[in-house]
């Protein structure tokens, strides 16, 4: 923690604090959705506690937690500490709703995209509890009927309560802004207010730290070389135990690599199941962007990767002017099927599916050849309800997953997820 993770974590706020130095003196204005050190701990099969990085109380190591340190209001009442993940999400939002939040730390972009959905569902309960001075039904704060009435009035005036209406002085949000998130965060950011800046979160995983932003690059950061020893394998081939690797000094801009790391925490040559793209160099240090998980789906003899889907979607959006709230892909018997939630009202533009098929032929190895040979049918596009992915996000949290772990999935891990997302299918495009 002291030599590998904590220096990485604290360094990740440098660009944010450089832009807004006053935040260091105003921890009460920072809402960190990612950290939840009082949440219940999971246990391994043999009974040992298992914690994700977001659950660790940094004070155990003599360190602060981040820009939000010292915000006494942010602590969930002890008698509610065993609340389920969805209720914990409500409790944190209820506490923050009374405050003048200026910065939102999400890290996981699904948290940034999900918060407006959560707020739309929970604001009446928030208003009621602020007026009474309760949190989760427990007396906790001074009753504030004036603030409660202000929130209710804004919801009535706008017909919806977005984060901007709740926190009009919001200035910045921090989240991963690459891969699938790069396609939907620009539209999501509008719900947080005009002029709100989006800062790239550090790139990392539960296995270890990877890259820390040092400037305003929107979605890439230089490798965090003090934290791990990194190796990279060509992502054009599946990674195996005997895959040849190169060092950070040998990385080539414009190429994709499997990420392998070792560090003093005990991991040795761990393939973390992530693929990164080398953007350029900062000095001699490679700057990388996360492109997706190393997961495949196969149809018609074609292995489809997450990064191929994201790049094909990006090209299709650019060609059609469409905007999306999220997307996912599944394998049919002889084709791939894409579920698209549009960010704009009405049906997807005419020809969307044809253009997506064209771009998949450009980004996915073997796709065009399989189409030409008749082994693969054209991609099928299903336009789903605008809120389909936010509903699935809520379902996952209500089912017991910690919200920091509920992430975007180009390929859903279970068939029932696809079934729920496409339950209110509105159109074929």
Model-predicted segments: where are they?
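Short, solvent-exposed loop/edge-beta patches enriched in aromatic
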Residues: 18-25, 97-100
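Amphipathic alpha-helical scaffolding segments
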Residues: 4-7, 30, 121
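Conserved AMP-binding A3 loop
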Residues: 1-10, 20-24
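Conserved nucleotide-state-sensing and coupling region of NTP-binding domains
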Residues: 25-42
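Hydrophobic alpha-helical transmembrane segments of membrane proteins
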Residues: 12-15
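Active-site glycine/GP-rich loop and adjacent strand/helix microenvironment
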Residues: 43-429
């Amino acid at each position: 923690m002291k030599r590998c993770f904590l220096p990485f974590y604290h360094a990740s706020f440098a660009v944010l604090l450089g832009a807004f130095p006053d935040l260091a003196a105003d921890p009460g204005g920072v809402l960190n959705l990612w950290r939840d050190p009082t949440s219940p701990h999971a246990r391994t099969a043999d009974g040992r506690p298992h914690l994700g990085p977001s659950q660790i109380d940094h004070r155990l190591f003599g360190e602060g937690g981040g820009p939000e340190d010292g915000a006494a209001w942010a602590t969930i009442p002890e008698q509610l500490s065993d609340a389920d993940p969805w209720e914990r999400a409500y409790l944190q939002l209820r506490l923050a709703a009374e405050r003048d939040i200026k910065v939102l730390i999400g890290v996981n972009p699904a948290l940034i995209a999900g918060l407006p959905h959560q707020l739309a569902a929970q604001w009446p309960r928030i208003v009621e509890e602020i007026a009474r001075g309760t949190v989760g039904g427990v007396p906790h704060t001074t009753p504030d009927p004036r603030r409660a009435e202000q929130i209710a009035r804004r919801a009535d005036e706008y017909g919806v309560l977005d984060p901007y209406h709740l926190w009009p002085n919001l200035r910045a949000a921090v989240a991963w802004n690459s891969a699938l998130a790069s396609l939907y965060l620009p539209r999501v950011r509008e719900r947080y207010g005009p002029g709100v800046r989006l800062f790239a979160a550090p790139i990392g995983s539960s296995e270890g730290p990877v890259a820390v932003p040092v400037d305003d690059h929107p979605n890439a950061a230089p490798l965090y070389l003090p934290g791990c020893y990194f190796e990279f394998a060509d992502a054009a081939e599946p990674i195996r135990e005997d895959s040849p690797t190169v060092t950070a000094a040998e990385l080539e801009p414009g190429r994709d690599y499997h990420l392998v790391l070792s560090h003093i925490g005990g991991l040795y040559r761990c393939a973390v199941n992530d693929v990164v793209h080398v953007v350029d160099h900062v000095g001699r240090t490679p700057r990388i962007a996360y492109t997706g998980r190393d997961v495949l789906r196969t149809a018609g003899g074609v292995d489809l990767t997450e990064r191929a889907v994201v790049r094909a979607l990006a090209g299709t959006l650019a060609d059609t002017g469409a905007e999306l709230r999220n997307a996912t892909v599944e394998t049919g018997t002889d084709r791939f099927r894409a579920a698209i939630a549009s960010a704009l009202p009405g049906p997807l533009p005419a020809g969307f599916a044809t253009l997506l098929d064209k771009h998949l032929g450009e980004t996915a190895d073997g796709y065009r050849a399989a189409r030409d040979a008749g082994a693969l049918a054209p991609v099928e596009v299903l336009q789903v309800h605008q809120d389909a992915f936010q509903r699935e996000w809520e379902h996952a949290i209500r089912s017991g997953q910690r919200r920091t772990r509920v992430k975007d999935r180009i390929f859903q891990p279970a068939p029932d997820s696809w079934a729920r997302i496409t339950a209110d299918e509105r159109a074929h495009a």
